[in-house]
């Protein structure tokens, strides 16, 4: 058994540190933590825009009332199970939730929410995310100890901001950090 104290990061946002994670899917990523227990962790990257999709055709919504495409951005949530889709959304929508957080956010993963969004009856804010990020027991804690991630409180307005490319820089500003002051060397004082 470990002497270390476990800090649950569910509902928090991980901010990739600059110059440490220098390439790949996690470079300048922001991850909303869905679950963090001693058995591991799961999160969704919410600033990796990959394309736009038509909800009606993607989910094969059969309804003649929707005559025009309902285009929504699609984000890459992580390297695990790209065939799984999730809606990270505001908690004003509460039908068949997969997860409900106490910070005005929820997660759904069903056809009903896509139909409701297509009909304009869905949540006020939402992101459609495919795939997710997962850590084995102790793996995220090791990454935090080696300064791969910074942790910040979640902010609904921040997650649903319009420009995904600027979210990471805005997260650093929110934390009071200037990217140019980061060293490419890692360590703890």
Swiss-Prot record:
Similarity comment: family membership: Belongs to the UPF0301 (AlgH) family.
Cellular-component GO terms for this entry: cytosol
Species in which this protein is naturally found: Rickettsia peacockii (strain Rustic)
Name the record gives this protein: UPF0301 protein RPR_01165
InterPro entries on file: AlgH-like (IPR003774)
Pfam families: DUF179
């Amino acid at each position: 058994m470990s002497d270390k104290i476990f800090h649950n990061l569910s509902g928090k946002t991980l901010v990739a540190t600059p110059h440490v994670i220098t390439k790949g899917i996690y470079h300048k990523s922001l991850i909303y933590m869905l679950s963090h227990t001693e058995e591991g962790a799961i999160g969704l990257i919410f600033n990796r825009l990959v394309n736009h999709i038509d909800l009606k055709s993607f989910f094969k919504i059969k309804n003649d009332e929707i005559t025009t495409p309902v285009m929504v951005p699609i984000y890459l949530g992580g390297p695990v199970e790209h065939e799984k889709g999730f809606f990270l959304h505001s908690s004003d929508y509460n039908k068949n939730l997969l997860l409900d957080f106490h910070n005005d956010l929820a997660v759904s993963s069903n056809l009903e929410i896509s139909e409701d969004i297509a009909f304009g009856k869905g949540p006020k804010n939402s992101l459609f995310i495919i795939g997710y990020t997962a850590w084995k027991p102790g793996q995220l804690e090791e990454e935090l100890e080696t300064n791969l991630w910074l942790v910040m409180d979640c902010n609904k307005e921040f997650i649903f901001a319009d420009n995904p490319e600027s979210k990471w820089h805005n997260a650093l500003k929110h934390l009071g950090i200037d990217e140019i002051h980061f060293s490419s060397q890692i360590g703890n004082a």
